Amino acid sequence: MRLASSQGATLLAAELAPADYAEVESRDLLSPYAAGVYWLTLGEQRMALLISAPSSTPWIEQSSAADLTIRFPATPSGCASSLARWQFFDQNFTLLHSQTVNRDQHPAPPIAPSQARWRSLSVIQSEYQGTIRVEQMQRLTIPID
């Protein structure tokens, strides 16, 4: 699998075992990819993906150590609603627990597992381009006191 910019620069590459489903994540980025056309190559198949401009409004804001605000992005026509998810990690960033946030409630974190050292809140927006699901995510990860 290879994802390349319109100029041909490799942005993401991975060896995938033959399967009906595969998932590949980019490294955490300090800045998002630019909007535009990208090329995804899966085996002998090459397809264009249109990546939209990232939101100029943060989806997650922290006003104090305990107070977080979620601004769910608008849902494009024909797409699933965005979702938010709490995750807890140990000191090695091994996932300990994950829980989806109810969109109608304040995003207060659930009780952290005793060995948790980090908590993370993510807002994820998904869209399909053919059979390919493209996710854009904003994440805030903070230490647990």
Regions found by a protein language model. Name each.
Residues 1-11, 80-98:
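Extended low-complexity, serine/threonine- and proline-enriched intrinsically disordered segments
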Residues 10-28, 102-110:
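Aromatic sugar-binding surface patches on proteins
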Residues 13-14, 45-55, 127-145:
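Edge beta-strands of extracellular beta-sandwich domains
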Residues 20-22, 31-33, 63-65, 79, ...:
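Surface-exposed coil/turn segments at beta-strand junctions on protein surfaces, enriched
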Residues 24-33, 48-52:
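Beta-sandwich interaction modules
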Residues 34-44, 114-138:
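Short, aromatic- and glycine-rich surface loops/edge beta-strands on solvent-exposed regions
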Residues 51-74, 142-145:
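Low-complexity, Pro/Ser/Thr- and charge-rich linker/hinge segments at domain boundaries
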Residues 91-119:
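Long, low-complexity serine/threonine/glycine- and acidic-rich segments characteristic of extracellular
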